[in-house]
Amino acid sequence: MTDSAKNPVSVSIIGGSGYTGAELMRLIAKHPHFRLFQVVANRNAGKKVEDIFPHLRHLNLPDFITFEEMNFDGIGLIFCALPHATSQEIIIKIPDGMKIIDLSADFRLESIEEYERWYGQKHIAHSLQEKAVYGLTEIYQKKIKKGSLIACTGCNSAATLYPILPLLKEGVITNDNLTINLGAGVSGAGRDAKQNIIHAEVSEGVKPYNVGKHRHIAELEQEFKKASNKKIDITFIPHLLPQNRGVIVSIPLSLPASLVHKTLEIFYEDSPFIIILPIEEVPATQHVRGSNFCHIGVVSDYNKNRSVVISVLDNLIKGSAGQAIQNANIMFDFCETSGLLESPIFP
């Protein structure tokens, strides 16, 4: 038995009553190296986890507490799963020296001005922003390993960046504009009641939303520029899908499929959670549901000098809680796949 199994890292979750918080609890409960010590959910403080999430009843999790009730002694890691703006207000109150993985948007953007422009909120934690590491695991693994504040990516951003960043880094994509078509399940909008995501509004139809002004554009612009050393103009067309989970991205490219496929295969050959499908095979969201895997497919256009790259992931796992656990594994020098090798749920 390893030392970490005998003496697991004590972790806490701040923001345990949302979908991401629930998935963090589920994943941590069966993780070989982490022990869930406390879960903060101010609105539900004093309640048992099973009162809010009956499906977690069997896990014997700690009751919800308030942030003021937190005990920081002996904590090795904090996951913060609060909404943007709220997250930074809480994180600045956490004692110095704590390792933190933040799942909000508050520390993803390197530019404070860009954050305030896209999110309409004042950024109040400039010193923390300066040391934050963008948490796209397979791209920034070395920085994540040394980091103390990891800013997990947006789910839509992750699904887009995984197929495109290698092509930019390797100089395969040379044009300065990209069109990104995306479909996302309703859980990406969070757990709070909103008219536009209730069953009667979403089922039996697909509709675009936030076309040209989705906040994840800021992340994409930032990361595309870092990978290519130039500004890439983005046309981003997200659609709300009548399903709970999943993100699917399709991006047309003026490149032959064989070149795109080979580049991605080589780039991700040592990445256990990024699966490059056989060329011409199309990925589907149901094939990654409930898992930490991202499937990427490359298909030829009728014009052989063009292709389409398609990626899928589960927004709550690889796009959020699973990504956070994977980053935590790297921070503590555990096996990258620890606690994350569950197969997708199908059908």
Name every feature range the model reports, one short phrase each.
Residues 18, 84, 130, 157-161, ...:
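Electropositive phosphate-/nucleotide-binding environments in soluble metabolic enzymes
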Residues 8, 133, 177, 233, ...:
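A residue-level signal for beta-strand positions that form part of recognition/binding surfaces
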Residues 2-204, 209-211, 229, 299-302, ...:
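N-terminal Rossmann-like NAD(P) cofactor-binding subdomain of oxidoreductases
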Residues 197-293:
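Contiguous C-terminal substrate-recognition/catalytic subdomains in enzyme active sites
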Residues 25, 161-165, 217-221, 265, ...:
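Predominant activation on well-ordered alpha-helical scaffold segments within soluble catalytic domains
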Residues 249-347:
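C-terminal active-site/capping subdomain that shapes the small-molecule cofactor and substrate pocket
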Residues 40, 65, 137, 181, ...:
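Residues in well-ordered beta-strands of folded domains
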